[in-house]
Amino acid sequence: MPRSNDPAEPQSESADLFAEPSSQHSSMRSGSEQVAGNMSPRSTSSASALQYGSEMGSVSQMSSASTLRRGGPRGDLGIAAVDHRTVQIRGMEDEMAGDDGQPRLYVWGTRICVADVQRSFRDFLTTFKISQLAEDENMMTGHDEALHEIDVNHPYYMERLLECNDAEVTHINLNLKHLNAFSEALYRKVIAYPADVIPYLDIVVNEVFAERFNRTLAQSIELRPFNAQKTRNMRGLNPNDVDQLITISGMVTRTSSLIPEMRSGYFQCAVCAFGIESEVDKGRIEEPVVCTNCSNTHCFQLVHNRSVFLDKQVVKLQESPDDMPSGETPHTVSVYAHGSLVESVQPGDRITVTGIFRATGMKVNPKQRALASVYRTSIDALHFRKMDTSRLHQDNGETITEERIQQIIELSKRPDIMDALAQSIAPSIYEHDDVKRGLLCLLFGGTRKDDETTNKTKLRSEINILLCGDPGTSKSQMLQYVYRLLPRSQYTSGKGSSAVGLTASVSRDADTKQLVLQTGALVLADNGVCCIDEFDKMNESARSVLHEVMEQQTLSIAKAGIICQLNARASVLAAANPVDSKWNRNKTIVENITLPHTLLSRFDLIFLIVDAQDEMQDRRLGNHLVSLYFENDGNQEKTEHVDMNLLRDYIAYAKANIHPKLSEEASQFIIEKYLFMRKAGAQHGQITAYPRQLESLIRLSEAHAKIRLSQEVSVDDVEKAFTLWREALKQSAVDPSTGRVDVAILASGMSASGRKAVEAMCEAVLKQLKTAKGFVTSKALFHTLKSADKTCQREVFDEAINELSKKESIARSGDRIRFQTEA
């Protein structure tokens, strides 16, 4: 815009965005000077819309002669009143005026005529029709508070006004793509000057509502624009976007408590009790200096209970992993939610925010008015569009169409649906069919049983899986695939994870100076999957927090006076390597990966992935790996996989709509299988099943029913789940000395045969110590037992000594041992 000291400066680019007739600056300037008292809105650099919020920008230029209806202030727009920053130009000086010669209202510093904007938007509301609607836009709430489909033969936004009348809804979501299709000029005005234009659009909406229904709601209807074409990622935000309408996507990492923000202050004179209301603009409130009633100065006091406050919440939005360059730290931005938008998002939600990008000056010294050259940026939210928790890694938030649902139902009727979907899990990884079936069950999950009305114990539906084995067997690749597939998933490495990073940390908020709880990976992965790589390298303090999460699905916090219990209903998918970088088949799983047995027993499936030496297997694997880098002429057969997008929609639809329950036949069959496993181990003095294994079998059976899109678990589902569960046990819970399955390895860390060997060693040690006089060194005692029995092992001997020491059957003094006589 030309300034008074530089008349030759060209007009700003923002003024050319709108399809309006051109006008001479001198005419507008003379008209505005005539009304505003010789102060031209263009005579200062602060009149630009991009610098809105400065001291000059907070001066209202609305003439008292305006006959336009006023609307209520909106906290999310950061303005004091609807007539903020407007100027009235009389007909003689207004080249864009009509034949009536009446004065018209313009947004200060622009060529945006308020009457033209309102007329165009009224036409849009009353005439705009669209046949293709997204699924989250084609439903409306009726008198009975039930959802009804919108009639596309009527104007779309008039149907939305009908919803406001029937269901007492006080907001309308404005799809800016609809506005752009109707009038590109009006769309650009909303994008460039949202704080100035949207309040007048609110007036039009309320006027049209009153004309059609002959009533007014208790609260004014507000517009919530979304789906702007000017969508930016956080790294793309720049000074050109300040005070403009933007749309960005990200993940919510933290939400503050509700903050009461003053919108209107009531000041009362301490001498004569005369009251004056003062509007708050951009967080600033001007205290009256002189009382107009008694003429005293500096005598006003703020009365809080007569002031107007508005709910406010600070939402920390973090850059989405899809938009983040590799090796970079994620960017964050503060989003301010006002009014009905507060408490609408939770940490871990992936959302799309439409709002006004703000830049606020920071003081060099809190006691001085001087501002630093660096400004703090934030976003005043106008609309939150939350991605459904059952949706998978899509940023547009669109739901599944009817055509896609029919395609999903047709796919579920295939007899080999389990194998077809399993082969589509990480198709570039060769074989590992059982592991892929287990991952498929993890993606679908079981049926949640948390009905509080029945006073029953809550049982988890999430399935936990551990992948262990030799390095280079695609364990991390499978974790990465699952992480990219699910919406509320978190990926972390055991070496770089701490207990605070997994659970929650307490920090002091920079704005409110209060202690706040910052949630970690397990809480952010609520209703999703937490992928933990290098599980064996995680320190003990970080690993100990998983015990409660993997069974109770909650996380108890007691830090710095903050005591709470957070939901962590997340499936845990972990990968671990053996101790010596090579799996030793002569050792149990507890000895190979040095994980506590209390944690191992909480995994539903433990898969052992070993790099076996087999020439034919190596040749097939080599051909598969080479085919990933070299494309042949199509001579080799290609396996048809389910399309990735179809697989995502299939899982989302099943998790949202299918909740299978056990049938009578399936219940009896599960009990028979459980008793069969118990009896099979009892013959050899081993335990092959615990109640936790029974619950795992039920969850796996429910997951198989979900894969078929069945609301009932059949006997065939139980049979397939039992086969998968048995194959996993054969790999992970086999006693190396006997070759039989022994679940006691997972439950107690030692097999039944190992327990018997330790008990026999305890008897031999006590027999030797009873005949010895005084203390005997453990080395000499072991050599004595070794000479009598060549099969004696040092590990069994040490375990026996520890057991006897716990029972206080022996007395130890360093390396010396003696028999403990009874008192």
From Swiss-Prot:
A motif (Arginine finger) lies at residues 601-604. It comes from the Eukaryota. Expressed in dividing cells with some protein being retained in quiescent cells (at protein level). Residues 405-729 form the MCM domain. One of its GO terms (molecular function) is ATP hydrolysis activity. Its EC number is 3.6.4.12. ATP 2 binds at Y430, K475, S476, N577. It is found in: Nucleus; Chromosome. Residues 1-77 are annotated as: Disordered. ATP 1 binds at K456, R602, R692, E695. Residues 21-67 have a biased composition (Polar residues). The keyword Ribosomal protein does not apply. Its main location: nucleus. GO terms for biological process: DNA replication; DNA strand elongation involved in DNA replication; double-strand break repair via break-induced replication; gonad development; locomotion; mitotic DNA replication initiation; nervous system development; premeiotic DNA replication. It catalyses: ATP + H2O = ADP + phosphate + H(+). It is an enzyme of class 3 (hydrolase). Disruption phenotype: RNAi-mediated knockdown causes embryonic arrest due to continued mitotic DNA segregation despite lack of DNA replication. Suppresses the S-phase checkpoint induced by rnr-1 inhibition or by hydroxyurea exposure. A zinc finger (C4-type) spans 269-294. It holds the Pfam family MCM_OB. Keywords: ATP-binding, Cell cycle, Chromosome, DNA replication, DNA-binding, Helicase, Hydrolase, Metal-binding, Nucleotide-binding, Nucleus, Zinc, Zinc-finger. GO terms for cellular component: chromosome; MCM complex; nucleus. Belongs to the MCM family. Acts as a component of the mcm2-7 complex (mcm complex) which is the putative replicative helicase essential for 'once per cell cycle' DNA replication initiation and elongation in eukaryotic cells. Core component of CDC45-MCM-GINS (CMG) helicase, the molecular machine that unwinds template DNA during replication, and around which the replisome is built. Component of the mcm2-7 complex. The complex forms a toroidal hexameric ring with the proposed subunit order mcm2-mcm6-mcm4-mcm7-mcm3-mcm5. Interacts with nmad-1. This is DNA replication licensing factor mcm-4. It comes from Caenorhabditis elegans.
